[in-house]
């Protein structure tokens, strides 16, 4: 059964900028491969092949315009107070939220249950291998302020590669947004 999510791919020019961030050493953090950098819109999870096929087709009905997407500052997600995820923030623009809502409407029409937690758009750049508050604080301090941006011209339905292969994510289908 495929494990799916929808996301906006990060363009190569922005990947290069993210690669220049002051990231922790490999013994402390697992750095996200550049080709895996993305902004998750909806995590779908494991679904049947038939539901994957239906989602792939129905997502073609999402029609929203391309938009300018801003990235801003570095941050950390913690679990029970322990830092785990290092990220670059994504401006929750009206256009991004409109796209996310349109995708969500399609997915819920297929009876796919979506995450109900507050949407906090970001690009995961690394995962700490063990809790390291000083490493997380240093990451934020060394990489803030940080700003960039790009034109979001499409979104994709992704599947997660089995067994930790690189890249970890495979585009099932890419969906173009309307030209600006």
Description of each model-found segment:
Residues 1-180:
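Histidine-dependent nucleotide/RNA phosphoesterase domain, centered on the 2H-phosphoesterase fold
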């Amino acid at each position: 059964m495929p494990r799916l999510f929808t996301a906006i791919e990060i363009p190569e020019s922005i990947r290069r900028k993210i690669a220049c961030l002051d990231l922790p050493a490999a013994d402390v953090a697992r750095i996200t491969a550049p080709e895996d950098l993305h902004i998750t819109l909806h995590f779908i999870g494991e679904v049947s092949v038939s539901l994957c096929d239906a989602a792939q087709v129905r997502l073609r009905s999402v029609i929203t315009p391309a938009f300018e997407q801003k990235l801003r500052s570095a941050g950390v997600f913690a679990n029970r107070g322990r830092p785990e995820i290092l990220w670059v923030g994504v401006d929750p623009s009206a256009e991004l939220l409109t796209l996310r809502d349109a995708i969500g409407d399609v997915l819920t029409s297929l009876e796919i249950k979506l995450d109900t937690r507050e949407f906090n758009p970001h690009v995961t750049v690394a995962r700490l291998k063990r809790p390291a508050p000083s490493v997380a604080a240093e990451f934020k301090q060394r990489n803030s302020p940080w700003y960039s941006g790009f034109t979001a011209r499409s979104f994709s339905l992704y599947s997660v590669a089995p067994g930790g292969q690189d890249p970890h994510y495979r585009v099932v289908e890419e969906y173009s947004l309307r030209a600006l």
